Structure formats: structure tokens, C-alpha cells
């Protein structure tokens, strides 16, 4: 009898284990759940900003690597591979940071595609008035604005790139070729023109300028239209080794007119003014004071203690203070900043002596490890 019962018991246990392992997690929600509630949609909308404030985005590699594009800013390098990397040389020893920007921007694109499709298929969207602003329509516009923002960075830095307007599905569908940049920019501009009237102004939103708003949508239309109508370096696909040539489409004037119209809307609708001094703008920025109706139209919503090295690399040089073990002290009054990114001395000297912006833009001091300030040995900051 014992030999009979043991296999039966084992079979029951295995069957139970299989049933147990196949259960659905109650903490996992599908689109049918998320996009039937405005509060859940808000969570998905917040997720669209994650790549922006990660080390791959505007507080990290995107700012640190892609802003070095003029004769104003520079940083020191010690090896030839660093120089090659800054020139996008394929033989560079480490170009992972550029790859992270690429993946970060497409992560943002896919998140926005998820939200756009989810809202469009939602019963809330079907019942919504699509002719005037509402919370749902604002979320919808916000998703399209952020998608355009991610694509603009891809086009600005890489030109013709893979283009998707739907969420990533079957992995076989991910391997697509590049789309002409003008097609991408045209689509994005048309998307924004469509949603601009149904978005809230920053002063009407509980997130102010730290989220996409109607006036930011207007400004982004103008900016993208200038790119769409401007000159860009086009590749010679018949000869990949060639440098290419500068070109622009015959309809360029149409997009300059769009840029003028929507930049004019930002100005004429009067939602923002320039009441603060140049100094006060930066004092408030460093004090986490974010007015909804002044100089800033959109602030990347980075948080205190979040990831990213923008302030660390581009900020004032703060000498590290060490603890008894030789490590950076956690209780240093000003923290620590490498100040590795600098402005050229010639740029500082281009300011008029009476221009009050000079000494705020080009800092001539650093914080010593005592917490006191001192004149920097090299007059570049």
C-alpha cells in the first residue's frame, strides 16, 4: 500500500506546484486596468519622465556628452581614445555613454507610445470631449509632447533614425531601418499642433513648469519647425564613406512661418514674464523655487538626491572633504563637485565689463575643503 500512495502524493504535489507557479501576480496591472482610471493614467504619465531624469538623459550623459558642440565649453582629456570618443569615432575605446543616450531616448519613445495607445483605446478617451482641455486630454497631449522631445534629440544628434509610433511588440518588429528625419519632424509637429489646444497652461496644472504644458508645447512646435525648415548634413547613402552634404527641403519657408506663429503664441498669450533679475533666476533654481509664470517654461523634473551628474560635472568646483578613512565626507557643507566641464577664457573675456551676467555665468572661485571660497587658479569655470 505504501508504494501506491507515495506516487499519488508526489503527483498531487507536482500538480499543485504547477498551479501555484501559474497564478497571476496581483501586483501586475494590464492596460485594460491602467487606462480606465485617471489616477492610474497619471502614474503611467509620470513614468514617461524616467528616462529624462536618468543618467542617460538631461541630467546625465545627454547633457554631458552632447553639449560640447561649440568653442565655448570644453573638458580635459588624457588619452587619444577620449578625443576619438568626443568626435564619435567608431574606433573609440569606450562609446558606451553615447549608446546609453540612444537607448534612453528610445526608452522614452516607447513609454510615450504605451501611454498614447493606452489612452486612445481607453473608454475614458472615447467619452471625452476632444475639443477642449481636460485632465485626460492634457495627459494625452503631454505624452505626445514628450515623444516629440525624445525624437527631437534623436534627430538632432543622429539624423535619420528608426521611427516607431506604436509600442514595441514582437521582437521581430524591432529591427527596422532608418526613417528620413523630415518625415519624423513633420509627424511630430503635426501631432503637437493637434494637441496644443487641449492642454493646460502651467499655471493651471498642479505640476507647474516641471511637466509639459500648453506653452511648452507651443515652444516645442516652434523649435522643431526651425529644425524642419533648416539646413542639415545629409548622408550619401551611395557612398557611406563620404561626408555628405548640407541640404534642406523646398518647403522650408512653411516651417519658418509655423515657428513664427507658435513662438508668437507663447509671447502674445502672456502666461510668462521676465520680472526676475538674471541672478535671481539662478538663486531660485538652486533654492528649488520654481515659479509657474516667469522665465522658465519647462524644467526637467529632477529631484533632490536623484541620479545624474549634471550639477557634479557642470557646477562650481567643490574640493572634496575627507573623513578619517580618506573617503569623501558625507557631512561636507557643500558636498563635492568635480567642476570638470569648463568655459573657455575667451568666452569670459567676450562679456562687457559692466555685464552683470558675466560673473554669474563664468565663476572665478571654488569651494575649498574648509568650506570657504577661494579664487580659482585657472580663470576658467
Report the location of each language-model feature:
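Secondary-structure transition into beta-strands, especially the periplasmic turns and strand N-termini
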Residues: 4-8, 14, 127-137, 152, ...
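Bacterial Sec-dependent N-terminal signal peptides
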Residues: 1-26
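Conserved, well-structured interaction surfaces
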Residues: 30, 42-56, 78-158, 172-186, ...
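Proline-rich low-complexity regions
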Residues: 25-26, 162-165, 199, 203
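Short edge-strand/loop segments of extracellular domains
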Residues: 167-171
